[in-house]
A protein has these predicted regions:
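Secondary-structure boundary/capping motif
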Residues: 46-47, 75, 106, 152, ...
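A glycine/threonine-rich phosphate-anchoring loop and its flanking beta-alpha core
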Residues: 13, 116-191
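Gly/Ser-rich catalytic serine loop of serine hydrolases
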Residues: 97-103, 149
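Glycine- (often His-adjacent) and acidic-residue-rich active-site loop
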Residues: 60, 72, 112-124
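Generic enzyme active-site microenvironment
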Residues: 68, 103-107, 143, 180
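Short, conserved catalytic/metal-binding motifs centered on acidic residues
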Residues: 18, 101, 145
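Short Gly/Thr/Asp-enriched flexible loops that form oxyanion-binding sites at enzyme active sites
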Residues: 82-84, 103-116, 154-155
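ATP/NTP phosphate-donor binding region
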Residues: 1-94
Length: 191
């Protein structure tokens, strides 16, 4: 059996890959001056020192950061809306996602809603979504992944659960502008 595999691929995300690449984050051109630093509502990001290391890299890059630590596994629409409100309240002009797929998915949706009015489901295409085009571009996202598997650090999608309708739908929000894939951040992931 012969298989013909043809595809086109476009990934505008700059990728820093390798051991200790997080230590090079400060040398990258940052897309903003104040970041909402999105992490999970768990303990590992802090306990393993990843949050402190990322905050230090942002500080060295001249970027202020505000931590948003409410993202749950399978992020909820209400969490995205709270994150967007926090980004607006603190005058953030970029989002940094530090975590696994759920954090990165939520961060991309937060980036969309931080720069657009209404409800996230206004911009969802599918299910009960209202299929509106966003008026403004999302805030730029920097993704620092601490797990491997979803590819959320290099795709534009964010899967979010609408707790009112029980829908779990991918929202095309934003390609991260920069992804840090540092295998040392994944050493604590269970096998």
């Amino acid at each position: 059996m012969k298989t013909k595999l043809n595809f086109n691929m476009w990934i505008p995300t700059r990728i820093l890959f390798g051991a200790d690449e997080l230590k090079n984050l400060h040398s990258q051109q940052m897309p903003g001056k104040k970041a909402l630093l999105a992490i999970s509502n768990g303990k590992s990001t802090r306990a393993n020192g990843y949050l402190a290391a990322t905050e230090e890299q942002l500080r060295l890059a001249g970027v202020e950061s505000v931590v948003f630590d409410r993202i749950e596994a399978n992020p909820l629409k209400s969490t995205v809306m709270a994150g967007a409100a926090a980004a607006r309240e603190h005058g953030c002009d970029m989002i940094v996602a530090l975590g696994g797929g759920s954090v990165m998915d939520a961060a991309k949706a937060i980036a969309l809603m931080a720069s657009n009015d209404g409800d996230l489901w206004d911009y969802v295409f599918g299910g009960t979504g209202k299929e509106q085009q966003a008026e403004h571009a999302p805030l730029p996202v920097v993704a620092v992944t601490t797990t491997a598997g979803t590819g959320s650090e290099v795709d534009p999608w964010g899967v979010v659960t609408n707790e009112q309708t029980h829908e779990k739908i991918g929202v095309e929000a934003a390609f991260p502008v920069l992804a840090v894939v540092d295998p040392k951040l994944m050493l604590t992931v269970p096998p």
